Amino acid sequence: PICAETCPRNPAMEQVLHRFTSQVDEKYSHIVGRFRRELTHPQRTQETELGNLFADIFTRSLGVDVMLIGSGSIRAEKLGPIVTYGDLIEGFPYDDGVFMFKVTGQQLRQMLRYMLREEAYTGHTEFYQLPSTLRLRYDRRKGDFDYFTYCGREVGKEIGDDALFTVGLQNYHFKNIESFFNISYDTLCKIQKPRSVATSCQDILMEYFREHEMLDAAVDGRMTILPSTAQTG
């Protein structure tokens, strides 16, 4: 049996373990960011506060027109107002890189229309959080957009078929782009060969958190789905 007689204490080993666990605790309890308030991500098949914040951070940090964040990669239902390293890697655990590619306005519209098909609302496909540069309203009954606008260059301008956009996508999602967006790698290469623009999503977030305090985000209607997923999901 394991007891004090058969397994006497080893003070030297206890000291080593204590030092190790203290270092681990210090690393994971280190504060990496501060929000103005707690931000939420209650459901992955709808626009969320955390999803909006992350999509905007990556879009700005990487200098792309549109960053599409896999909604399922945000595992936390809430985060903040104090964000520790442990909170971040638990809430956004997949430390993937990012690929950038170019698409036309017509292709971007087709990609997001495919993303918003009916299977998305039952959890059978991936869903994406959008940056504030995009604003759209999708009508599930007709399977198309009421409007699909880009606000980065001209506010409220309807996206033309021939317009070109740089899009960022996490590596895992890029490798599965045909399954998730119904567009092939070969099709993307006809405009420009996709390339890696970042190796660590977590590093991008932490760097942005260091440079910007008291961050906030709101569900601002950038992605409106009718009827809403709350009514039907």
Where are the regions a protein language model picked out?
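Catalytic centers of hydrolytic enzymes
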Residues: 1-61, 65-233
